[in-house]
Amino acid sequence: MVKLNSNPSEKGTKPPSVEDGFQTVPLITPLEVNHLQLPAPEKVIVKTRTEYQPEQKNKGKFRVPKIAEFTVTILVSLALAFLACIVFLVVYKAFTYDHSCPEGFVYKHKRCIPASLDAYYSSQDPNSRSRFYTVISHYSVAKQSTARAIGPWLSAAAVIHEPKPPKTQGH
């Protein structure tokens, strides 16, 4: 405890009195330098990595981590291959999924074909199916060519119903 109203410089000059009620045990004891540090060894031995390797080979634990890493690598690669197969199958099924067609149509060769045309061409010879697709492709090409011939700036009705100028009889 610290005594109130006392000057620290007077502490050493005035002998402590019993009336103060404080014990006379010093708070700080002097330290000796010999107790602070351990004596330094005269010879220091530094063990290197090469000294530890023969010990590890003798223990037999050196092979265990390699086998564990190898099996983990195999398991991870098998899991990735399995996931790749699943993704491939999902994508394959998405592209080859049987698409629904409106009523009266049949899905053949990635197209919706009217059922009556499919029945008609299936009763014909086997080459008729290729002729059917040829007719469809020519129809779409012809449809595009007539639209281009008119011109995008003119309407189709204006070209068809355009009044012709009267012919004048020449001299």
From Swiss-Prot:
Stretches assigned to the Lumenal side: 93-171
Transmembrane segments: 72-92
Main location: membrane
Polar residues bias (residue ranges): 1-10
Topological domain ranges for the Cytoplasmic compartment: 1-71
Topology in membrane: Single-pass type II membrane protein
Region entry Disordered, spans: 1-21
Compartment list: Membrane; Golgi apparatus, trans-Golgi network membrane; Cell projection, Dendrite; Endosome membrane
GO biological process, one term: clathrin coat assembly
Cited Pfam families: Calcyon (PF06387)
InterPro entries according to UniProt: NSG
A Gene Ontology term for the protein's cellular component: late endosome
Record keywords, A-Z: Cell projection, Cytoplasmic vesicle, Endosome, Golgi apparatus, Lysosome, Membrane, Signal-anchor, Transmembrane, Transmembrane helix
GO molecular-function terms, A-Z: clathrin light chain binding
Family indicated by similarity: Belongs to the NSG family.
Name of this chain's protein: Neuronal vesicle trafficking-associated protein 2
